[in-house]
Amino acid sequence: MTAQSQIYSGAFADPVFEAQSVFRSLMDCFARPGIIGRLSTAAAPPAPLGEASGAVALTLCDHDTPVWLSPALSKSSAPKWIAFHTGAGVTDTKDEPRFAFFEKGAAVPGFDQFALGTQEYPDRSTTLVVEVEALEGGQPLIGRGPGIKNGIVIAPKGLPDVFLDLWAANRAIFPRGIDLVLTAREAVLCLPRTTKLERE
């Protein structure tokens, strides 16, 4: 498949139904942080943008949601694919986007480089969509907070070594801060800024 043809293919076959399905899965995962949601819909974005990350983009992005992409994604067909299928524009400035996407293995900068919202409007922040190697099999972490009863153990594989430090700093500025969607293949795991994480 040529780079040009990749731009126009790989979106939802039934955009309304599939976007609604993905949206419900994401809302459920944000309401119950730490659970793994399996997306029942198929997206085939251009590499290196992953399947679940592409589905998130198709569901949440539109012309009112600027998007930031990692350097590798920016050099791929992903910017044109996202723009064609969602209408979202790509920005080079980290403090502007509503969503930021990272492919598997990409370096994730400090969360404070992105929009963190304000005390009055904490929702005006960036949601990071980060693909990891897997959502299980990594360093076990205990999650606590709203939507979590008695704690939950998560073990995403492929998080940066400094992730817990970044997350602790993010929680310290609540209600401001970023929210996080981890993806792997067709699955997602959501971590709102209210979730506290520590090593098991």
UniProtKB/Swiss-Prot annotation:
EC no. given is 2.7.8.37
Kindly give the InterPro entries that the UniProt entry links to this protein: PhnH-like_sp (IPR038058), Phosphonate_metab_PhnH (IPR008772)
The record's top EC class is transferase
Give the molecular function GO annotations: alpha-D-ribose 1-methylphosphonate 5-triphosphate synthase activity
Would the keyword Cell division turn up in this protein's UniProt record?
no
| One Pfam short name | PhnH
**Has UniProt tagged this entry with the keyword Transferase?**
yes
Q: Which reaction does it catalyse?
A: methylphosphonate + ATP = alpha-D-ribose 1-methylphosphonate 5-triphosphate + adenine
A Gene Ontology biological process noted in the UniProt record is: organic phosphonate metabolic process
Signal peptide region: none
Q: Which UniProt keywords apply?
A: Plasmid, Transferase
The record's family statement is: Belongs to the PhnH family.
Q: What does this protein do?
A: Together with PhnG, PhnI and PhnL is required for the transfer of the ribose triphosphate moiety from ATP to methyl phosphonate.
What is the name of this protein? Alpha-D-ribose 1-methylphosphonate 5-triphosphate synthase subunit PhnH
State the organism named in the record: Rhizobium meliloti (strain 1021)
